[in-house]
From Swiss-Prot:
Lineage: Eukaryota, Metazoa, Chordata, Craniata, Vertebrata
Classification via InterPro entries: Cyt_b/b6_C, Cyt_b/b6_C_sf, Cyt_b/b6_N, Cytb/b6-like_sf, Cytochrome_b, Cytochrome_b_C_euk/bac, Cytochrome_b_N_euk/bac, Di-haem_cyt_TM
One GO CC term, this protein: respiratory chain complex III
Protein family: Belongs to the cytochrome b family.
Keywords of this entry: Electron transport, Heme, Iron, Membrane, Metal-binding, Mitochondrion, Mitochondrion inner membrane, Respiratory chain, Transmembrane, Transmembrane helix, Transport, Ubiquinone
This protein's record includes keyword Nucleotide-binding: no
PROSITE patterns the UniProt entry points to: CYTB_CTER, CYTB_NTER
Ligand binding (a ubiquinone): 201
Protein name: Cytochrome b
Subcellular location: Mitochondrion inner membrane
UniProt-listed Gene3D superfamilies: Cytochrome Bc1 Complex, Chain C
Residues that coordinate or bind heme b b562: 83, 182
CDD domains registered for this protein in UniProt: cytochrome_b_C, Cytochrome_b_N
Membrane-spanning ranges: 33-53, 77-98, 113-133, 178-198, 226-246, 288-308, 320-340, 347-367
Gene for this chain: MT-CYB
Amino acid sequence: MTILRKTHPLMKIVNHAFIDLPAPSNISGWWNFGSLLGLCLIIQIVSGLFLAMHYTPDTLTAFSSVTHICRDVNYGWLIRNMHANGASLFFICLYLHIGRGIYYGSYTYMETWNIGIILLFLVMATAFMGYVLPWGQMSFWGATVITNLLSAIPYIGTDLVEWIWGGFSVDKATLNRFFAFHFILPFIIAAMAMVHLLFLHETGSNNPLGIPSDSDKIPFHPYYTSKDLLGVIIILVLFXSLVLFSPDLLGDPDNYSPANPLNTPPHIKPEWYFLFAYAILRSIPNKLGGVVALVLSILILALFPHIQTANQRSLMFRPISQFLFWLLVSDVLILTWIGGQPVEPPFIIIGQIASILYFLIILALMPIAGLIENKLLKW
């Protein structure tokens, strides 16, 4: 008798994806983040579903409904804190996952990489709309400022912004539609993640050496299921510690004040995971230029497969490119710090230098380093 998991139409799909999948024998802990992102998505969908049962998307009651969840609903404070900090965990795993992809040259799997970029945009859109829902000060002003950026689009900008708002300012219609989109997008993300996996399993996983591993494969289960489980346990311990001990560590105190259109907060800034892009936006004194740079700061990831000049795929044996990679990581951290600072000297010039460096490293220095390393290999 054949094993059921290999013959049953549904179980066969799961089997090929998570059990009998041939995986490279040498992939490291950096390959854990895919499964951890799946875990984050599940945490967010489940906690979000329970929050949606008690939340009201109305400008008059949204803020008090969140307060009601925290005070009156059984374990509501826990669900809310899990959902708010789950977004931070999601982005930590996401950025580490992308960093891994850049370091080990995983971007050469074009379809997987491009679906990943679409996923990044979807997650960012979902997180932004979710931040608006509690209807605190930073929710309202963040929504106003970020949606207003679309008015920089020539000719159709103003109409587009008013169409998104559903009126002439961020109001009840905006909150309502943001709630609707925030609810549906995670399911679209889950579907896209399936496509992401589908394309990945067409080619098989990359590995730290960046060389074909067809001659040395091991089954995914039990080797990588146990390895992923270890990652899950570590992440859940860290996550639970953050949620239970310092749930407001990554949030903005301004969001504990109800939204007031007549009172602008001293520093309008998004959540920490958008600060690097926000810093790039602010470092250009032209509105349209800033918006273009903001979009390009993420879209530039799509160029990686096209600007690789090195003969070796991974950065494991490429010291010059390694240096530039870690310089890029440091640069993104500096941009994140600058994004949270007020617009005044010396932060303005630091942000501008860091923004130029961000694009320079990716578009010029890394391809040049690849060519130099090719020459060094021939010596």
